[in-house]
Amino acid sequence: MIDTHAHLHLIDRPTTELLDSAANAGVSHVVQVAIDLPSIYKNLNDYAFVSNCSITGGIHPLSVSDDVDLDAVLALLKQHIDRFVAIGETGLDYKYGNDNKKMQHLFFEAQLSFARTHQKPVIIHSRHSDEDMLKIVNQYPDVKKVFHCYATNYDFFEALAGDLNYVSFTGMITYAKKGKVIRSMREVPM
């Protein structure tokens, strides 16, 4: 079994202990996903050379701010591009309002463009942003995209351009109030 989306950097335990625990649970490989600049560095320093771990690099929409130097992030990703299996976690998240909507768009589009240039897949976080998400991602039909924690309807999936779009469902499918997600899970091709 492979864990395709882990945030081990958020757990205060030694790397070897975390990966040993995963292996004991039957997880043979972990994709360690970055969400901000510190987690990109942590991935490069703690996880990049671990045999049963792959890393990503990217800025999560809730990590976007004036304090984050996008050019510096992209330069760091480029410097270590061969170590990253994907770009992300990136995307759009309007759950807490859209005060930084323009900035989220800027960071997201820059990371999609970077992924296209370097032929890397993108791990996408999308919450309460379907219309804007479609406008942006459909400009990149040639970029492989994984919609992490898919939480919308099947119409969204059908509206995606190209055939390089994948979705992952999480434990939210066990919630009775998530009917549209359960319907999507039944309809999205596996």
Describe the residue ranges of each PLM region.
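Mid-domain alpha/beta scaffold segments of enzyme catalytic cores
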Residues: 1-190
